Amino acid sequence: MSKDFLLEIGMEEMPAKFAPGAVTQMENNARKMLQELRLEYKNLKVYVTPRRLCLYVQELAEKQQDIKEEAKGPAKKAAYDADGQPTKAAVGFARGQGVAVEDLYLKEFNGVPYVYALKQLPGEDTEKLLPKFCLDLIASLNFPKPMRWGHYEVRFARPIRWLVALFGDQIIPFSYVGLQSGRTTQGHRTLGGYVRLTKPAEYLEALEAAYVIADQDRRKETIRQQIKALAAKVGGYVDEDEDLLTEVNNLLEYPTALLGEVDVKYMILPEEVITTPMKEHQRYFPVRGEDGKLLPYFVTVRNGDSTSLDLVKEGNKKVLKARLEDAAFYYREDLKKPLPSLVPQLDRVVYHEKLGTVGQRVERLRKLSALIADYLGLKSEQKELVDRTALLAKADLITHMVYDFPELQGIMGAYYAGSNGEPSEVCQGIMEHYMPRFAGDDFPRCFTGKVVSIADKLDAIVGAFGVGIQPTGSQDPYALRRQALGVVGMLMQEEKDLSLHVLIQDSYRIFADQKITLEPLEKIRPALEDFFKQRIRYLLQENGLRYDVLDAVLAQQADRPYSIAGQAKALAACRKEAGFISYLNAYVRCANLSKKASGAPWAPSDLADPTEIELWNKLQQIAPVVKSKTDKLDFLEAYTQAAQLVPDIEKLFEAVMIMVEEESLRAARLGLLQECVKTLGCLGDLTQLA
């Protein structure tokens, strides 16, 4: 038998950003706790709105599963006398376990026979277990910035104001923060009232009658469709912005979308100047025409019904107008000062107390960008554009617009540089040097943006590690992981195969040139290189490469992301070929035996058997070709060439014993195997695949 179970935690308005994590936590914790309680159920769902967090368990068993438990008793010699009759020890053990002495059985433990009893433990009624389950579940939820209220010691997202707990039509009684659980929930703060539930199945329908759509998935889809319909009325559409849609969804309980107008005088502003206040500050959805350009409309969503919608629309329009008026003023004021004139002011802006000013950082970016441009083989005119980009990259931090809208850094710099007549490559580079800004963002497309972006991120990472700032667990306040992923991702696109080891060294030296004291390079280099290695692994795994393939490649080198990516892809492809198993076996056997080499010099002339001499001669022909192909990063062809050695290696193992008594011959054979490992290892350390 089973019944539906409902637990609702009603509270004051919870920040929208708390909602996704709360849902995940509540669902995971509830599943784990129900499993530990041996309570079966059909389905489990968590609902969330700003004012409630609800667990709904469908067809929860009315009773725990019965279990059988084996208990170990005294040894056989103590449990039975010489005649095989149970002793007092056996009788007492049986009584203590609640079984008949005849039901005891023997079983060996560490070679000694003991008596055992199999106990049948009946499950408890679910109704008795649920009060503690509710209390434990509520207490298990954590939030980024929880609150305390009243005289209570507990913390929660926001003060809890009511509790509902129903198992079928029965209230599950418990008390928490001075509140008693019951069957009464609350509807919309202004449109709904108190809602009395007789059973969990009524929950969604009863709340919707009180102007609350509790199912966040349905609420989100309702918003999506309303927005789409309103934008279509003016011949437009709204960009797919799941983050904004999710945030809006978690800000309200009963969505009603409305279409607002933007004063056309603001439409001459740069697009981002219009959309940023809309999206970031007001949570409005900008409307675009079929050509992709902004239309003078926006869609917003109110938390309520359609009552007085025109009044609400006018209020939203006024708020946006004030925002855009400020933005227009800042934009006009910023245009009065050429972007290059702002660069000296960066000397007065502190980047980090131990890493100097932003002005000093700009000088570091120029020097590091110049080195990267050299490594990439850029032409002199391209290098000049890179230097100009690095010089102006941070200048917009001084502007009014970026001060008020920090998310526009780089974007406004590009607009201002363009208005000053800077080359398009410089403008694009200023905008792109912050990319990728977030997971899944594009990499810079322009060479200026790419070079300065690599320099910018390397400077941030090396500087942070140099003053003891490293990501720990989920904490990464300087977004160093994202920046490292950006560096690695961009280097994987560069055919020049740049070295992280060299770039880290260059960045460190530039800090030293400015007399900025960092931890010794030899102290931080291992952590830095391992940090980048993990980012390389992550990116390639995201691209579908197996962990053992990456183990094989990264065991060989973790310095050059471009060649690592090429080598890993080649290994993954070669692994599928019919002859790869033989290749792998040959490599592993050579590698394992060659570890026994003493390291002493050996002479090919000491090789005696025709099979080993033939292998050595063939190796002399093939090894240079394999090295040449590997140096050119043509790993597939390198593998094809190296694979020619496999039949000869197999013949060698059939014909001779490697570990012979004669020292010079043994050394020569082990040396030969070492050379084979070097050539066959063109795809990585293949012992990682064995």
Question: Which residue ranges define each predicted feature?
Answer:
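Amphipathic alpha-helical "coupling" segments that flank catalytic cores
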Residues: 1-690
